Swiss-Prot record:
The lineage of its organism: Bacteria, Pseudomonadati, Pseudomonadota, Alphaproteobacteria, Hyphomicrobiales. Keywords: Aminoacyl-tRNA synthetase, ATP-binding, Cytoplasm, Ligase, Metal-binding, Nucleotide-binding, Protein biosynthesis, RNA-binding, tRNA-binding, Zinc. It comes from Mesorhizobium japonicum (strain LMG 29417 / CECT 9101 / MAFF 303099). This is Threonine--tRNA ligase. One of its GO terms (cellular component) is cytosol. Zn(2+) binds at residues 343, 394, 526. Residues 1-64 form the TGS domain. Catalyzes the attachment of threonine to tRNA(Thr) in a two-step reaction: L-threonine is first activated by ATP to form Thr-AMP and then transferred to the acceptor end of tRNA(Thr). Also edits incorrectly charged L-seryl-tRNA(Thr).
Length: 658
């Protein structure tokens, strides 16, 4: 063929095709059944419309509805159908943007009267009608002038702004489904009929145009869409369970923390919540000691000159909290900022004193308080805050030590997650983005090392740990590993990171003396296990639904009396429990025992020891455990021994068994 392309299929076979053949034609040439199932195709990982010509050689895949990548297409197409339905029902409504998000999509609308959930049934009915029409998605490329004229005639002023924001060298793509069309980069499935009916509108919210509070407020409609009804129902069940486990609700019930208007995005920790926080810190501190980390503490407030050197002032200034010294009338004009990250401070500590290659690796760890501005609408309990604590560490090592240090970090991260009950973990390697610092040779070297480490992680786990590569998703200063854990109801949370940094050591002139007596730049590795410790605690609260294992519970035991005649004995029991290292309190109130048990169960106390006149006489306790109706009567000494053993932390249990 004169204009042919060479395609490599997933089975490794290679065939030549006419470059003008479309993805649909390719699927048809393979089999009619595949052509019926196809919703898109991909060349070299880039998903394309079935109507697109092949155009170039590469690895090809036909995407069907059961492919994970089809979900994004289903959701994208459903967003377009939502927009068409709204404009059919309420002519004059302006459409703005409608992206795919995790587990669904949203679309922002400009309308004098905001939408409410009461509008959902009629919108969903209209959406089903549009899907049933099975109109093909067609694509055209318009000139900038034509696009602006058409959308201006339609009164779509927000689309005009979007057109102006598109770089001149990029095509303006218009996707139509029947008579309705929208400005869109694509790709889309072949027709609206391929969407199916496994979708649901979820909620409405206000959203400023372009996220700027100076712009008009729009109405955002959120929705979800899935490949089939079973997936949709499973998702709805998960949401119901997530609502029951909401850490904000459990935080109130367990008296752990609260938020208030005077401190948006910062946590007011109550005694029990702070105890839980300290339990996590103490556990992490012991794990770091095992691994040879040095715990340090860098200043909270630093001059902007340091942030300029680090690059944060240029890259991150809008998210930093700035302060001046001693008010406006001081003669000191220096500008300071609360630290958004711990890393520049750790470089200063590494630089303090001459380092030899024999001193490496140097591992500096900090439970560092950092502050980052988040829009008020983005704040969400412990999960999204403005002030939080990072379990941050930075390893300064030689290039030869990089692989072994990454593996040590990996082992620490995985064992930590296992101790907290997370055993479904995936590790993603994010590689070089388009905008980056460092030479291609340095990136090649680092990515080769981390790719080898990733393969070792996979094989050592017997393929239990899922690994993948995120092309172009690395930070501007180096490639990174992202650790994603799955919780009890199937949600995924990205927590841990291991990140190579080419940037900061060079910017700050950090060096060590090599074996040849020459100055050498160390490799710097950023490492976090929890990430934000507040967020990690929120994840733990929801994962356990407040039913913490005894070793981690902020309140382990309550001794509740049936009668005032047992008050003295209950006080003695609490004293002995505390002497054994358990967190225990007495409930001597003049209330019925069922009321006490119900109240402490709501507060998620793992163990309630009930004491009455008989228990006092026999030196026994009646044990009731959270979530169980069973009762067990044991002698006091035996009960204390049993609970003390159960409360041993996993790391101490391992050390004891070694």
């Amino acid at each position: 063929m004169l204009n042919s392309v060479s395609l490599t299929f997933p089975d490794g076979s290679v065939r030549d095709y006419d470059a003008a053949m479309t993805g649909a034609g390719l699927a048809e040439s393979i089999s009619k059944s595949l052509a019926k199932k196809a919703v898109a195709y991909a060349i070299n990982g880039t998903v394309r419309d079935l109507s697109d010509p092949l155009g170039k050689s590469g690895k090809v895949e036909i995407i069907t509805r059961d492919d994970a990548r089809a979900l994004e297409l289903i959701r994208h197409d459903t967003a377009h159908v939502l927009a068409e339905a709204v404009q059919e029902l309420w002519p004059g409504t302006q459409v703005t943007i409608g992206p795919v998000i995790e587990n669904g999509f949203y679309y922002d609308f400009a309308r004098n009267e905001p939408f409410t959930p009461d509008d959902f049934p009629v919108i969903e009915k209209k959406m089903r009608e549009i899907i049933a029409r099975n109109k093909p998605f067609t694509k055209e490329v318009w000139s900038r002038d034509k696009a602006k004229k058409v959308f201006a005639d339609k009164g779509e002023r927000y689309k005009l702004e979007l057109i102006d924001a598109i770089p001149e060298d990029q095509d303006l793509k218009i996707y139509a489904q029947g008579d309705w069309f929208d400005l869109c980069r694509g790709p889309h499935m072949a027709s609206t009929g391929q969407i199916g009916n496994a979708f649901k509108l979820m909620k409405v919210a206000g959203a400023y145009w372009r996220g700027d509070s100076n712009n008009p407020m729009l109405t955002r409609i959120y929705g979800t869409a899935w490949a089939d009804q079973a997936q949709l129902e499973a998702y709805q069940t998960m949401l119901e369970e997530a609502e029951k486990r909401d850490h904000r609700k459990l935080g109130r019930e367990m008296d752990l923390f609260h938020f208030q208007e005077e401190g948006p995005g910062v946590v007011f920790w109550h005694a029990k919540g702070w105890k839980m926080f300290q339990n996590l810190v103490n556990y992490m501190r012991r794990r770091l000691d095992e691994q040879g980390y040095q715990e340090v503490n860098a200043p909270q407030v630093l001059d902007k000159s340091l942030w300029e050197t680090s690059g944060h002032w240029g890259w991150y200034r809008d998210a930093m909290f700035k302060v001046t010294v001693a008010g406006d009338d001081t003669d000191d004009d220096r500008v300071f900022a609360l630290k958004p990250m711990n890393c520049p401070g750790h470089v200063q500590i590494f630089k303090h004193g001459l380092k030899s290659y024999r001193d490496l690796p140097v591992k500096l760890a900090e439970f560092g308080n950092v502050h980052r501005y988040e829009p008020s609408g983005a704040l969400h309990g412990l999960m999204r805050v403005r002030g939080f604590t990072q379990d941050d560490a930075h390893i300064f090592c030689t290039e030869e030590q990089l692989a072994s240090e990454c593996l040590r970090i990996n082992d620490l991260i995985l064992s930590t997650y296992a101790d907290f009950g997370f055993d479904e973990i995936s590790v993603k390697l994010s590689t070089r983005p388009d905008k980056r610092v460092g030479t291609d040779e340095a990136w090649d070297h680092a990515e080769a090392i981390m790719g080898s480490v990733l393969e070792t992680i996979r094989t050592r786990s017997g393929n239990r740990i899922k690994t993948s590569i995120n092309p172009g998703e690395g930070a501007f200063y180096g490639p990174k590993f992202e650790y994603v854990l799955k919780d009890a109801i199937g949600r995924e949370w990205q927590c841990g990171t291991t990140q190579v940094d080419f940037n900061l050591p060079e910017r700050f002139g950090a060096f060590y003396i090599g074996s040849d007596s020459e100055k050498k730049q160390p490799v710097m590795v950023h490492r976090a296990i929890c990430g934000s410790m507040e967020r990690f605690l929120g994840i733990l609260i929801e994962n356990y639904s407040g039913h913490f294992p005894l070793w981690f519970a902020p309140q382990q035991v309550v001794v509740a009396t049936i009668t005032s005649e047992a008050d003295g004995y209950a006080t003695e029991v609490v004293a002995k429990l505390k002497a054994a290292g358990l967190l225990a309190e007495a409930d001597l109130r003049n209330e019925k025992i069922n009321y006490k048990v119900r109240e402490h169960s709501l507060a998620k106390v793992p163990v309630i020891l009930v004491c009455g006149k008989r228990e006092a006489e026999e030196q026994t306790v009646n044990i009731r455990r959270l979530g169980s109706r069973d009762q067990e009567s044991l002698g006091l000494a035996e009960a204390i021994a049993q609970l003390t053993e159960e409360a041993v932390t996993p790391d101490r249990r391992r050390k004891r068994a070694a």
